[in-house]
Amino acid sequence: MSSWLPQNVQKRLLIYLLQQISIFSQIDTTNLDVSLGCRSQFAFHDVELNVDHMRVPHITVESGHISELELGLVVSGGLDITGDGLCFVVRPELSEVAGSHDLAQSLARSIMDLTNSMMQPLPEVLEGDEVLANSCSEAGDAQQPASSSALDKMRNKVLERALSNLTVRIINVRIQVLFPGQQSITVLVGSVELSTVDKTRRVDLQDICISHSELVPSPEQPDEFMSTSASNSIYMSAIDSLPFGSRSKMEENARNVRALLQMDKLHVTFQGISSVEDISIRDLMLHMGRVDVFLDAIIAVDIGVFEVLVQFVAEFQQDTEVSETSNTLQNYKRFRQEQNLEEDLQITGFTIEELRITLSQSVKVSVIDIQLRNRYIENSTVTVGRVTICDYDLDLLHIDAGSKPCLELTVDSRKLQRIISVDGDIHMDISSTFVSSLIPLIFRLQELGRGLHFVGTNNCKMSQEFKTQVETKTIILSLPVGDDTLQMIIQPISYELSLHTVFTDFISISKVQSSETRDIAIIREIKIGYQTANFQVKSYNLKLSETLLTSKLRGSVSSVELYCSDSDIKWLFDGLSPYQDMITPYMHSKPEVRKPIMNKSVRILSASSVIHRQNVFSDMVLLIERITCSLSADSISSFGNVKTELNSSLLSLNTDNSIIFHSSCVKGSTVFSDVKYCLFEPIKTKDVTKPALFVQRFENGKLKVNVQNTCIYYHAKWLDILDESKGTKSTPQQESAVPVPLQQRIEVKFHDCALSMHPYRLKSALLICVNRCILDISVPPANFKCIIRSPTFMLADDCSNMKTSITESWESLVRYYSKAGFAVIGKSGLLSCTIKQSGGQICLDIDVDRIDLSICADSFQCLIQTLIDIKPPVSFPDEKKYRTEPCSIPVFENVDDEFFVPKGTSNLPALNDMHIVDDFINNSNNSFSEVQVIEETEEGSPLKLEDNGLLFDEGHFNKEDIPVATDSKFFPFGPVAIVLHLFVRKASIKLHDGYDWVYTRRSISKVVDDLEDEVHKQDQPGRVETSLFDSIYLYATPDSNIKKAVSSNIQSEDIIAENYSSKMKLRPSKHHKILIELTNMKLTFSGYSYDEPTEDIADWSTDLLNSIDVEVKTFEIVDNVATSTWNKFLTELKEAHGGSPSMLALSISLVRPIDFLYATELIISAQVSPLRLHVDQDTLDFLIRFSEFKDARFDLIDDYPDIVYIQRFEVNSIDVKLDYKPKKVDYVGLKSGHTSELMNFFTLDGAKMTLKRVVLYGVDGLGELHNCLSSIWTPDITRSQLSGVLKGVTPLKSIITLGSGVKALVTVPLKEYRQDQRLTRSLQKGARDFLKTTSGELIRLGVRMASGTQAILENTEEFFGGQGARARCMSARLPEDELSPVPSACDEFDLFRSSIPRKQSPIVPIPSEEDDIEPLKAISLYADQPQNAQKGVKEAYGSLGKNLTIAYGAVRRAQRDARHSISAQDAATAFARATPIAFIRPMIGATEAVSKTLQGISNQMDRDQLVHMRDKYKQSSHYQRKRER
């Protein structure tokens, strides 16, 4: 109970309060009630306050109003102040400069005025009018302090007595705070009571409510709005639940009223304000009841309100800062600790019974029993009894703390340590309602965070003395996803505030299905730290150049382990899609790009240079040592788990809203059918300087990926999973309309990567090395665009023999894989690929600039078989392809056997001559014993009279009025599923001699060694024969050099030099032998959709499965065999060109005759332009040997072998003009009956023939197709086109041509005379034709005779030791990779020591790669022909001079050798060698001069002949350079 207050002091206190009523302006006496006596009382009604005398720091009081105010003296000696309806309208006053201690000075001044007023003498008569009249003057005098300090103790005692007996109670308090933008916050307090009990000040507040509203200007007083009447223009929807207050008449001026906070009671007790010297507040105790915070309404407040509040708080904190005094020094603190002296605390206790935070209408957070106990010597603690989150009546949060507080904060002042601990495991069940409530809060807070600048927070300094640590127990989060639950378990978290570091051992993410829990992801050793100073980390950009990441937030993770299946991924996507739909509406608003500082380039000084690196600012950098992912396919269990590993990864969240991720090493593997397969792996494992994987996501959603130094694998066996998935495919369900997502673009770049493709059954591998590739993907719809620059193709025959690790340094991928065992087979130019998806159709366009292939016989077979086996084989048993058992048809099921039998008639006896029918059937079945292949010509085959007398028209069914199944349009087909367009501008295929594979070379060497051993072991000399790879035939005799024969056979050499090395030349030849060139090749593949019905529901229709159309504009085969002087093996016949757009057109269709049977058939149609062939026998033998090579390792054996059945084959008539040069005759084959060897006896020049149009039906396989065509075309040529062939035989060609000229001399005049009856003109025309034909042929005959004479002379000279034909090629060097060279050196022939001449060797064998000397090439005498007679004479003069120079040089060398000779025999030998050259060389020059002159004359007469000669004969290099000039 408070002490008694003397009456004089009581009156003085009342006088002071009345003096302070001076803030009332123009008080109306009608509203003033005064009661004097033993209990003096003053009552005021509806008084407007004069706000000019109110001074509150950083606050401007706009208006004030109080409805009722009573001041009275209590009989017990106290003073009561009672008020009702107190309203204030205030506005925050923000200024850059404010007083530092305004609040403290105002409080001290008020205490001093109160004390002085009570110490002054009272007037004798206390009348109300006098008090009011003198209030102002007395108040001014009271402000002067007493001059003497002797009364300080009395003054303090009087003040204490006065305050202890002062009671203030005000109800219905309303404070309205105005903000810019017509925003306001209103604070309502039901009652406020101030009292003192036992020297303890008590403040009780009841029914507190804080709300926000928007103000609407009054139409009557728009200019005076927000003035003194603004306090009555507030409408509060929450006041209906409050027991006080009435609504204002102008409540309609407020709109969008939201309650922000409600509190039922607030009880405050404190010590202090007892004297002038003691105005501090000590031992402050706060006790709150139930507090409701409406967070959803708070974040909906306009951002301008938050900006003002933040700045106001910042300035208020600056004003209340007190400079350090002695009691804050460390020495003073240590003294108080040693003396056990307790320091006065401002807040000693804080209690909240229940704190309820409303996130939405259904989700509420409840915090119960919050207590603060603050002691100086002992540890200060803050405890939280219980925390719950409720979704309606469902508890989402549970902390297993038992009876203990779930949350505790301990402050140890001695150790300067703060510990925040959670005393139980946290279980959080996240519901969809909770997520839908939390998402708008998060995005709104992010928006507020971006909009607020937090003015003044930079000046707030956090104490660094205390070490704050946060410790939690296990945190378990559960999120319902579909029918199951996604659970996250976070191990105890440790947070160091001083170090700004958060650490936890690991986080596990699991899938809870019924009672089963399975881990999906585990993250280990997570550490996240914030640094006050920026740190830098090395990173990379899109060009894989080094950059620097600058950030303050850094995290590290030891490992990330992912374990999931395809069903888990689908479950996550389907289950999380509702949550994504919740986030999507908030993602439409484009966030503001934060650019606190622009990216800069940083110069890094080194010892000898300056390195410029780009500097990128990041919000957070996360370093991950190791990422492992194990992905399994539940629907395809046989594929196994796909394990992926990424090492040394970095994840950066940049300030420009982009994301960067890169990893230095990427590996992937799987176990398929108990065999481990590699998916992708790094190529270079040592000295890796750039990341293997780089991913960057930009703000607009575009994703860019860079892959480097990685080999990607493809195994054909993986496609078996498609068959497995077909069996498990569920029935398609009708899907509801789904909104089309935004288009996503992904750009992938590959640098120094490789694609390794492995076939299904073979051990070979096809490798594509890519230096640079750009892949652009956009979805949806799925569109792909790929550009590859200069890919290189490599091939390996057996991957088990590859070198797995190469320690040597390598310059490029090609060199690396070459060392590993791969062979380079070709390269390509620019390759572009486009894939578009439209509806159910996929369109693939491939454009290739150039393809160059260089391949040998063994690698060619390996390549073809690998391409065939690059997909799983498809084969079916005969039961699925054909109807092996005829189905029984009950023909007589509904036939009445007695229908034609008369009633009463007995059954006739069975006839005994029914064998007549059997004889008829037996005699007639021979007519159908065999089905023959039908052949047709353009005019139709002549009708043939068969033995039975019937006349058959074989072309009846191929007439124009009957549709023929020549294209896919004849058959019904379904919609197109896939379309492939391939366009190759130029393709070159170079066929090399020799062998690429070590296995092939070792096999040949082993067989040769075995042959030599077998020959030496024979008792009687004999011949041993064997064959290899179906193309190499070997035999050995005791006197033969088997290795020399093998090299001759493999390298296409007829004669081997005597000094030939004993080592066989089995490696690929340095220069190609055959060059196949194709230009403007177009390929179109169309795959159609088809059904696979059963026999019961089948309609027995024919299905078109796919079709292929190939067009080639030009197709040429260039002859580069060393022993051949011809240039083009095959080219287009130019004089017969009919204007066809393509030289070759091929159409292939794959059909299924019966829809429910799996048997397929081919329909082939070919169109070929007229051909010009220059066939050299050596070249032909090389092509045959090349194409017949067969290695058993590459045989493809199907489970159910099948032969390609050709339903229909059609080829047009082909005009062929053939030149053939035989080299040798196989007499053994001729004796065996091979009549084709007779062609090797004749040389053909311009033999004309026509391969007539053929249509074949029912051909079993390509081999049978070749036999059928041969059996049709060969008899036709020998029967009806023998004259055209004989005209091309060289000895007969001139005679036939001259004979045709003589014939024209007679037939032409007769024909012309019959037409115009003019004898003279007819004779002139006949003579002109005769001269043109005979003169041209005589000139060509002269050329052949001169060239033949020159060849004889050159051979004779070479026989006597001269250069022979090599003299013409002395200056002709082979360009790189063009024509095969011949050596320039020859063996020396000793005229006196040997009488046996060496074998004629005009063409010296081609060396392999081991040879260092570049040989010369063989040039025909008909090559390098002059264009006209003038150039012919000029070249004749040059040829004659060159040969005379050679003869003169031989004589000069003989004279020099004779002078330096020791004996006469040596001198004679020198002259003997030079004599044949000296005599023969001038004759060779003369014959060559005649030949060149006649060639010039002939070419001038026939210009087209020169073009034909250039196509036929190889040109020398100097002649080609001359033409270019």
Swiss-Prot record:
It comes from the Eukaryota. GO terms for cellular component: endoplasmic reticulum membrane; phagophore; phagophore assembly site; phagophore assembly site membrane. Belongs to the ATG2 family. It is a peripheral membrane protein. It catalyses: a 1,2-diacyl-sn-glycero-3-phosphocholine(in) = a 1,2-diacyl-sn-glycero-3-phosphocholine(out); a 1,2-diacyl-sn-glycero-3-phospho-L-serine(in) = a 1,2-diacyl-sn-glycero-3-phospho-L-serine(out); a 1,2-diacyl-sn-glycero-3-phosphoethanolamine(in) = a 1,2-diacyl-sn-glycero-3-phosphoethanolamine(out). GO terms for biological process: autophagosome assembly; autophagy of mitochondrion; glycophagy; lipid transport; pexophagy; piecemeal microautophagy of the nucleus; protein transport; reticulophagy. Keywords: Autophagy, Endoplasmic reticulum, Lipid transport, Membrane, Protein transport, Transport. The gene is ATG2. Lipid transfer protein required for autophagosome completion and peroxisome degradation. Tethers the edge of the isolation membrane (IM) to the endoplasmic reticulum (ER) and mediates direct lipid transfer from ER to IM for IM expansion. ATG2 binds to the ER exit site (ERES), which is the membrane source for autophagosome formation, using basic residues in its N-terminal region (NR) and to the expanding edge of the IM through its C-terminal region. The latter binding is assisted by an ATG18-PtdIns3P interaction. It comes from Eremothecium gossypii (strain ATCC 10895 / CBS 109.51 / FGSC 9923 / NRRL Y-1056). It is found in: Preautophagosomal structure membrane; Endoplasmic reticulum membrane. Disulfide bonds: none annotated. This is Autophagy-related protein 2. Pfam families: ATG2_CAD. One of its GO terms (molecular function) is phosphatidylinositol-3-phosphate binding. Coiled coil: none annotated.
